[in-house]
From Swiss-Prot:
Residues that hold Mg(2+) according to the record: 8, 10, 214
Keyword RNA-binding appears in the UniProt entry: no
Identification of the protein by name: Putative phosphatase bbp_030
Family statement drawn from the similarity comment of this UniProt entry: Belongs to the HAD-like hydrolase superfamily. Cof family.
Keywords per UniProt: Hydrolase, Magnesium, Metal-binding
One Pfam family from the record: Hydrolase_3
Residues forming the catalytic site: 8 (nucleophile)
Length: 267
């Protein structure tokens, strides 16, 4: 049996309309009541992930900002890791010159954006969390957990990814959560490493975990788990990089909850 269940949110556990269905909530509650540990593993900020936790109304672990922050069942922060400030400064100096790319940053409590142009970059519904426009001279002094770049032109993001890896690859972990969203965290930060930490804390092996995801920021978690399942709607690069993983249905059809119901409750 898998004693830990970990799931991404957007494109995975959430519906395409960015909400938890009643069926999904029911299955997760049954799992927790059965003694299974449930982990939400998301690129979203804690201030958004905690709203999902409230909807579930059961104690769950939260891996937020792709692992830059981890919270236990009592909502206590148990791990944090920020990007080196010199890297944040140099990245912003480079990317602020390209006005087609929207720059967004997470600090511990806030969400910052380079401008208010969301027409090209609004990727998902925000759960009661509002952004602020940043100023370069002040933002570079703050502790930043995650930077993400969004753009209509995916080729520009692919070029940016190559540039970041070649110049700052030893300092940062780079991945696409969506086709048009490139995310940057500190080098050791990933959902996989975070799940390993939680498993260790519980006295379990990460091989006792089953995980679900759809983006490249889920790759380490899916690969390290005892069983990784990717969504039918997964990023094409994820399918290419982990060809042996089982592909379940789309997030349109409660596929994570249906899969969990099948393996835990035989229905």
């Amino acid at each position: 049996m898998y004693y830990i269940v970990a799931s991404d949110l957007d494109g995975t556990l959430l519906s395409p309309q960015f909400y938890l269905t009643e069926y999904t909530k029911k299955i997760i509650k049954r799992l927790v009541n059965k003694g299974i540990y449930f982990v939400i593993a998301t690129g979203r900020h804690y201030n958004e992930a905690k709203e999902i936790q409230k909807m579930l109304n059961v104690p769950v672990f939260l891996i937020t900002s792709n692992g830059a922050r981890i919270y236990d069942l009592n909502k206590k922060l148990i791990y944090s890791c920020d990007i080196e400030q010199k890297v944040v400064k140099e990245l912003l100096q480079k990317c602020l010159l390209n006005h087609d790319i929207l720059i967004q940053l997470y600090s511990h409590n806030n969400w910052y954006v380079s401008n208010n142009n969301y027409s090209a970059s609004s990727l998902y519904v925000s759960f009661s969390f509002r952004s602020k426009i940043f100023e370069f001279k002040t933002i570079i002094k703050k502790k930043i957990s995650k930077i993400f770049f969004t753009c209509k032109n995916v080729k520009k993001l692919l070029c940016l990814e190559k540039y970041i890896i070649s110049h700052w690859g030893k300092y940062v972990n780079v991945s696409f959560s969506f086709l048009n969203c490139l995310e940057i965290m500190s080098k050791t930060v990933s959902k996989g490493n975070s799940l390993q930490l939680i498993a260790n804390m519980l006295g379990l092996s990460i091989k006792n975990c089953i995980s679900f995801g759809d983006g490249m920021n889920d790759k380490e978690m899916l690969d390290m788990s005892g069983k990784g399942c990717m969504m039918d709607n997964s990023h094409y690069l994820l399918k290419k990089s982990l060809p042996n993983l089982e592909i379940i249905g789309s997030n349109k059809f409660d596929s994570v909850a249906m899969y969990l119901n099948k393996i835990y409750f035989k229905k």
